[in-house]
């Protein structure tokens, strides 16, 4: 795979949706009508199937592995919520009890041997196992924004990255056309191009990207966004380190760090105000919004991917316990369909 195409591939791989098509000419008709298909009854699932096919076309089918965020490893730990967050949400996440967490760190894209220093999103998936038996998922990436405001953008970008049959490479004119036609891609693309990759997952912030609704005991809703801030501080590779970095270092760095004690993140919740975007994960909220500490995540172990408790978890971001609800963000809802298809395929391959 040529370098320029690889960089664009990983740049769109921020969630379990991102990749590009390498052999999708039969789906051209679908791509020409992605907006109408995605918005029609059953269309969300059709686009999700096409996206998963595209992942396999771009990266190959790696049996038993996730179609995206393929490279990663597992972890376990616990979360303790705050009373302040409990005033805004009746979720058991914020009862103040220690909640069991199973997690996974990952690199965007469908390449199981991706370089740990590539300029692509890093992921953190968390499953909270509440004492009442309910499950709650939080799935995040390390960029503050996403690249697409609608599901149709996915296939548009994948088709722009399709290999030309004659050259075996993506057509630069199609890539340029995509960039021009989809300005919602620009913010994340710029972030990845100008921000060096993290030196360790322990030094990596993670963003929920979407807007969610907290529901309190009286039924009042509050729009929120959240991020997880590393207690060890944020740290990116320097330019010199980026050049010299080995292909593999993230697993070893986390193993070494967790041996020293729990690796912690603070969950920071931002309170939305009227006019703040509810349904567009490419748009950041203005600075200066009220923020609260909603809890502390502590991770205490490392496990290789397929030996970890996270291996069989879907990390569907629409898996929410009572007290937290989704907005009408079409990308958030689309992720659920795409994750389910990826999960189903890999489970049948094990």
Predicted regions and their residues:
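Active-site-adjacent core segments of small-molecule enzymes
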Residues: 2-19, 24, 29-350
């Amino acid at each position: 795979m040529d370098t320029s195409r690889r960089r664009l591939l990983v740049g769109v791989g921020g969630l379990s949706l991102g990749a590009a098509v390498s052999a999708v000419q039969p789906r051209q008709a679908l791509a020409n009508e992605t907006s109408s298909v995605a918005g029609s009854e059953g269309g969300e699932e059709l686009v999700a199937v096409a996206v998963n096919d595209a992942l396999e076309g771009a990266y190959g089918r790696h049996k038993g592995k996730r179609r995206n965020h393929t490279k990663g490893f597992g972890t376990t730990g616990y979360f303790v919520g705050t009373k302040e967050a409990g005033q805004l949400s009746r979720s058991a996440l914020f009862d103040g009890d220690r909640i069991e967490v199973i997690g996974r760190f990952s690199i965007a894209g469908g390449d199981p041997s991706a370089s740990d220093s590539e300029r692509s999103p890093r992921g953190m998936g968390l499953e909270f196992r509440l004492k009442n038996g309910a499950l709650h998922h939080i799935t995040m990436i390390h960029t503050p924004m996403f690249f697409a405001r609608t599901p149709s953008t996915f296939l548009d970008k994948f088709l722009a990255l399709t290999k030309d049959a004659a050259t075996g490479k993506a057509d630069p004119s199609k890539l340029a056309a995509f960039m021009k036609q989809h300005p919602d891609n620009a913010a994340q693309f710029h972030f990845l191009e100008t921000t060096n990759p993290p030196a360790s997952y322990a030094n990596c912030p993670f963003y929920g990207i979407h807007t969610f609704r907290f529901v309190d005991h009286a039924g009042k809703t509050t729009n929120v966004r959240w991020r997880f801030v590393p207690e060890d501080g944020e740290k990116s590779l320097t330019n010199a380190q980026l050049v010299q970095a080995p292909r593999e270092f993230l697993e070893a760095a986390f193993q070494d760090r967790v041996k020293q004690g729990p690796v912690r993140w603070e969950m920071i919740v931002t309170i939305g105000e009227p006019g703040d975007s509810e349904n567009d994960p490419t748009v950041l909220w203005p600075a200066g919004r009220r923020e609260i500490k909603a809890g502390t995540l502590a991770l205490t172990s490392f496990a290789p991917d397929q030996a970890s408790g996270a291996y069989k978890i879907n990390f569907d971001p629409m898996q929410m316990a009572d007290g937290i609800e989704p907005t009408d963000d079409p990308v958030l809802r689309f992720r659920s369909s795409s994750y389910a298809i990826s999960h189903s395929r890999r489970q049948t391959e094990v």
